[in-house]
UniProtKB/Swiss-Prot annotation:
Lineage: Bacteria, Bacillati, Cyanobacteriota, Cyanophyceae, Synechococcales
GO biological-process terms attached to the record: translation
Keywords on record: Ribonucleoprotein, Ribosomal protein
Organism name: Prochlorococcus marinus (strain MIT 9215)
InterPro entries with a match to the protein in the record: Ribosomal_bL28, Ribosomal_bL28/bL31-like_sf, Ribosomal_bL28_bact-type, Ribosomal_bL28_sf
Designated name of the protein: Large ribosomal subunit protein bL28
One cellular component term from this protein's GO annotations in UniProt: ribonucleoprotein complex
Amino acid sequence: MSRVCELTGAKANNGMAVSHSHIRTKKLQQVNLQKRRLWWEEGKKWVNIKISTKALKSIQKVGLDKFAKSNGVDLQKF
């Protein structure tokens, strides 16, 4: 199972962990993914989808259908 948001395509970011003595080591910052069952009003069905919490906030603001269309995602495949 890949750690990629199915709506936005957000994935892990490579960063550095910096200690108090300024020793830098590589660190992977993962996306906060959640499995959600969302109601798709236009399709009149439930959609099981793995999305980031940032995408979930956007869906609550503008709606699932509008957000999916703006990101070029077809909800029929879910």
